[in-house]
Regions:
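Alpha-helix N-cap/helix-start motif
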Residues: 72, 102-103, 135, 139, ...
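Solvent-exposed loop/turn segments at secondary-structure junctions
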Residues: 67-71, 98-102, 129-136, 162-165, ...
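Structural microenvironment flanking redox-active thiols in thiol-disulfide oxidoreductases
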Residues: 87-115, 120-147
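C-terminal cap of thioredoxin/glutaredoxin-like
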Residues: 3-5, 148-233
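Extracytoplasmic/secreted envelope proteins and their assembly/folding machinery
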Residues: 76-83, 106-110, 123, 139, ...
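Extracytoplasmic thiol/disulfide redox context detector
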Residues: 2-101, 216-233
Length: 233
C-alpha cells in the first residue's frame, strides 16, 4: 500500500509539472508577436553588402546630399538639430551625391569647404546658389561664395582643382554607385547597412525617426561590453 501511494504521489507531481509546462506554452502562444515599428523594404532599405565605416567603435550615420537639391536644403535644419542631441556612440558624416557629370563640380565645393573648415553658413550659401541653377559650373561664381568667408580666389582655385579634391570626388562617386546604391537626395545610410529615404509614407522628419530606430537596432547587436558607451549623449 505504501509503495502504491508513493507511486501515485510521483505521478501526481509529474502531471502537475506537465500541466504547468503546457500553460506556459499556451500563454506564450497567446502573446502577440512584437511588430517592428519600421520595416525593411518599406521604411528603409537593407544594403546588399555592408560597407566598412570609418570608426569601428561608433555607429556611423552618413548623409547623402546635393547642393542643387531643394529637399536637401529643407532637410538641413532637421539634420543639424538632430546632430545636437546625437548620442556619444554615433558618428555623423556627409558625402556629396555624384551621379552625373554636372554634379562633380558641386561635390568638389563641399570638399573645399571641408578642407578649409569653414562655418556651416557656407553650405547654406551654396544651396542658395545651386538650387537656382543646378547645372552651374562657374569657378568665378563659386570663388565669390568662398570669398565671403575670407578665402582668396587663389586659395580657392588651388584647392578646387587639387589632386586631393578630385580624388575625394572620385571616391564619393564610386561609393554612391557601387556601395550605397543611392539614387536620390537627401538620403541617410546607417552604419553602412541601411539606407533611409523620404517618400512612401516617410517624411523628412520621419527619416530621422527611422535613423534613430536603426541606431538602436545596431546598438542592440553590439557586444554587452560596448553598450556602456551607449546613448549617454
Amino acid at each position: 500500500m505504501t509503495l502504491l501511494l508513493s507511486s501515485l504521489q510521483r505521478l501526481a507531481r509529474s502531471l502537475a509539472v506537465l500541466m504547468a509546462a503546457c500553460l506556459v506554452v499556451v500563454g506564450a502562444q497567446a502573446q502577440p508577436m512584437a511588430i517592428p515599428k519600421y520595416i525593411a523594404g518599406e521604411h528603409y532599405q537593407v544594403l546588399p553588402e555592408p560597407i566598412k565605416v570609418v570608426a569601428d567603435d561608433k555607429i556611423e550615420v552618413m548623409e547623402i546630399f546635393w547642393y542643387g537639391c531643394g529637399h536637401c536644403k529643407d532637410f538641413e535644419p532637421l539634420i543639424v538639430a538632430w546632430q545636437k542631441s546625437m548620442p556619444d556612440d554615433v558618428a555623423f558624416a556627409r558625402t556629396p551625391a555624384v551621379w552625373r557629370k554636372q554634379m562633380r563640380p558641386h561635390a568638389a565645393l563641399y570638399y573645399v569647404a571641408e578642407a578649409l573648415d569653414l562655418p556651416h553658413e557656407v553650405h547654406i550659401d551654396l544651396f542658395n546658389l545651386l538650387i537656382k541653377n543646378r547645372s552651374l559650373n562657374d569657378q568665378k561664381k563659386f570663388a565669390a561664395v568662398f570669398a565671403r568667408y575670407g578665402v582668396s580666389s587663389e586659395d580657392f582655385d588651388k584647392l578646387y582643382k587639387s589632386f586631393g579634391t578630385t580624388s575625394k570626388v572620385n571616391k564619393a562617386e564610386k561609393r554612391l554607385r557601387k556601395n550605397y546604391l543611392s539614387q536620390g537626395t537627401p538620403e541617410v545610410v546607417v552604419n553602412g547597412k541601411y539606407r533611409v529615404s523620404s517618400g512612401k509614407g516617410v517624411s523628412q522628419a520621419g527619416m530621422l525617426e527611422v535613423v534613430n530606430f536603426l541606431i538602436e537596432l545596431e546598438r542592440s547587436a553590439k557586444p554587452v561590453a560596448a553598450l556602456s558607451a551607449g546613448a549617454a549623449g
